[in-house]
Amino acid sequence: MNKTVVVAMSGGVDSSVVAYLLKKYTSYRVLGIFMKNWEEEDSNGLCSTAKDYEDVERVAEQLDIPYYTVSFAREYRERVFSRFLKEYSQGYTPNPDVLCNREIKFDLLQKKVVELGGDFLATGHYCRLDVKSQRVGLLRGKDPHKDQSYFLCGTHPESLKNVLFPLGDMTKREVRSIAAQAGLATAQKRDSTGICFIGKRPFKSFLEQFVPNVEGEIIDYDSQKIVGNHEGAHYYTIGQRRGLDIGGSEKPCYVVGKDMEKNIVYIVRGEDHPLLYQQELTAKELNWFVSPESITRCSAKVRYRSPDEECEILHTGTQDTVRVRFTSPVKAITPGQTIAFYDGERCLGGGIIEVAMTPHSV
């Protein structure tokens, strides 16, 4: 009897092509499943869930595959969104996509796949798996512009044992071409960007619905003078330049620190200001695809679009945290963001940035 693969279909071109490739070129029995993580009424209809589901229906019917829908809205709110709000209110800048992969897609959705009689879960992620050894390995996707291993660095290896990433060896251009040649209904659909529960709204207007505004001061760190006011330090992230509304300087202003107790935002002037650069950080909530004791030197990404930075991992004697020392100073390391570790194309693991060390305290 042929094995069954359940495709996580988002209504986008990537997951549509995954379903198409598995249906056309494999002997698997292919099912589609649409995962709803956010109640549309909570986002004033801006999360496009209904339109996305319509696109899933159209593609599934084109391919003649059964399709299902499942709602994890309550679990998403409890396990992802509530933490997102808590961390923002504490001054961190969390990445909900990394948490969603760990808590929802490769946990709850995996369990749903089993309920449906599935042997595998397939998604449209641009990354690859190494299943040759007992421990599943995570590799970068072939397309460096679309590689999504960063977003999976926090997902436990055991959760990826029965997962397929058919797009891992493909570029986005190739995927678009396949979708067009196959006449898929989503072939011309634009890629989704940003956080789904925010939709098209400005981030601040969304967040202020859940975290109250508290007016405070913006202070120039060097002069210690008040240079502006804000409606809440939680709205600002380290390295932020836009939205400060501070004049009187030829050099651009950047957020360099926040005092959450006093509700103060500190800025510096000039993109080369030394306080914008850090050479060491502490990471927590670690997840490894290899034995951590075997890692001394590697490279790391401190945010999705950042370049790889050469670093040394200093083990602290506990399994909960590590110190990371970079070969060269790195700009705007942001507590709350995910750090992913690499050795070439192999993702070694990841964690959450707890604190970045600067030569001076901010």
Curated annotation (Swiss-Prot):
The active site is at 100 (nucleophile), 196 (cysteine persulfide intermediate). InterPro entries: MnmA-like (IPR004506), MnmA-like_C (IPR046885), MnmA-like_central (IPR046884), MnmA-like_central_sf (IPR023382), Rossmann-like_a/b/a_fold (IPR014729). The record marks 125, 337 as: Interaction with tRNA. Its main location: cytoplasm. Keywords: ATP-binding, Cytoplasm, Disulfide bond, Nucleotide-binding, RNA-binding, Transferase, tRNA processing, tRNA-binding. Disulfide bonds join 100-196. One of its GO terms (molecular function) is tRNA-uridine 2-sulfurtransferase activity. It catalyses: S-sulfanyl-L-cysteinyl-[protein] + uridine(34) in tRNA + AH2 + ATP = 2-thiouridine(34) in tRNA + L-cysteinyl-[protein] + A + AMP + diphosphate + H(+). Residues 146-148, 303-304 are annotated as: Interaction with tRNA. Residues 95-97 are annotated as: Interaction with target base in tRNA. ATP binds at residues 8-15, 35, 124. Its EC number is 2.8.1.13. GO terms for biological process: tRNA wobble position uridine thiolation. One of its GO terms (cellular component) is cytoplasm. It is found in: Cytoplasm. NCBIfam families: PRK00143.1, trmU. Catalyzes the 2-thiolation of uridine at the wobble position (U34) of tRNA, leading to the formation of s(2)U34. Belongs to the MnmA/TRMU family. This is tRNA-specific 2-thiouridylase MnmA. The lineage of its organism: Bacteria, Pseudomonadati, Chlamydiota, Chlamydiia, Chlamydiales. The gene is mnmA.
